[in-house]
């Protein structure tokens, strides 16, 4: 019997949804196959904003997850639908998920250059600054809000107290804002030159860092988790209304 997972949102959201499906497949033996329903993306274009919504596409092809598993669920099928943004949703298959989320992407020379720079540092720290659609999309802004300079200042101060000579790698689509607001020695700002296929360059590079200052974004959550982050700092207020903070692991620091 097939178990269907309804995919929605961007890459980080799809990763949570897929993980919940893998977990359910293990938990309920009556299901033998996991299928991905990507009908949410029909007629959408990547990064096109229309009527207050950001267009999305099926993104799990950046890993070794076959597109052959994408199939619209027939009427009457068992369907998992939700966001599942909590480690408890797939803790029973976490090792399997780490293996399945192996990148199947040919990264650019620029991305490989930054990767080499990360490996050359004793204490490479990833900082993710999510602005973009959180600013220009009214729905995203009212739902997520935007992390301001104060959050990053406090987080950097904490990292500096924990590590000797950390080197910060800032990943963002808003390079100008980062240049004006992220002030610390030993800083490399990584912008669109390392986006690569479906923006995976930033996620891949974040997984190579030792510790992480994440945004209120599932994208950077995965950067920290897949990177086995030594020290992760995240926002106490994940969504603008104050909900959603249970996405943070118990061992992560909230600011």
Residue map of PLM features:
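N-terminal pre-catalytic "stem/leader" segment of glycosyltransferase-like enzymes
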Residues: 1-39
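Short, solvent-exposed loop/turn segments at secondary-structure junctions
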Residues: 10-12, 39-44, 84-88, 130-135, ...
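Gly/Pro- and small hydrophobic-enriched strand-loop and loop-to-helix capping segments
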Residues: 26-37, 226-255
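Structural motif
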Residues: 2, 124-125, 167, 211
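Conserved aromatic-histidine-acidic binding/catalytic patches
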Residues: 5-13, 140-144, 197, 211
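Short beta-strand segments
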Residues: 35-40, 128, 167-172
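Secretory-pathway luminal glycosyltransferase catalytic domains
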Residues: 43-163
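Donor-binding and catalytic core of enzymes assembling or modifying cell-surface/extracellular glycoconjugates
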Residues: 11, 158-233, 240-242, 247
């Amino acid at each position: 019997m097939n178990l269907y997972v309804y995919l929605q949102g961007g890459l980080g959201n799809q990763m949570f949804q897929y993980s919940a499906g893998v977990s359910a497949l293990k938990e309920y033996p009556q299901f033998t196959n996991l299928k991905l329903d990507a009908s949410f993306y029909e007629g959408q274009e990547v990064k096109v904003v229309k009527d207050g919504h950001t267009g999305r596409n099926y993104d799990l092809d950046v890993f070794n997850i076959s597109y052959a598993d994408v199939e619209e669920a027939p009427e009457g099928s068992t369907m998992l639908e939700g966001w599942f943004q909590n480690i408890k949703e797939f803790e029973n298959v976490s090792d399997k998920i780490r293996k399945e989320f192996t990148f199947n992407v040919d990264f650019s020379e620029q991305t490989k250059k930054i990767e080499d720079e990360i490996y050359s540092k004793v204490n490479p720290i990833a900082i993710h600054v999510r602005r973009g659609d959180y600013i220009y999309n009214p729905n995203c802004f009212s739902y997520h809000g935007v992390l301001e300079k104060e959050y990053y200042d406090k987080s950097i101060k904490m990292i500096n107290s924990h590590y000797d000579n950390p080197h910060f790698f800032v990943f963002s689509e808003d390079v100008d804002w980062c240049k004006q607001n992220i002030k610390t020695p030993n800083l490399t700002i990584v912008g669109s030159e390392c986006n690569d296929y479906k923006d995976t360059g930033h996620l891949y590079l974040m997984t190579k860092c030792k510790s992480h200052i994440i945004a209120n974004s599932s994208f950077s959550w995965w950067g920290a988790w897949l990177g086995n982050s030594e020290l992760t700092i995240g926002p106490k207020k994940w969504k603008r209304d104050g909900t959603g903070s249970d996405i943070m692991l118990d061992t992560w620091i909230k600011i």
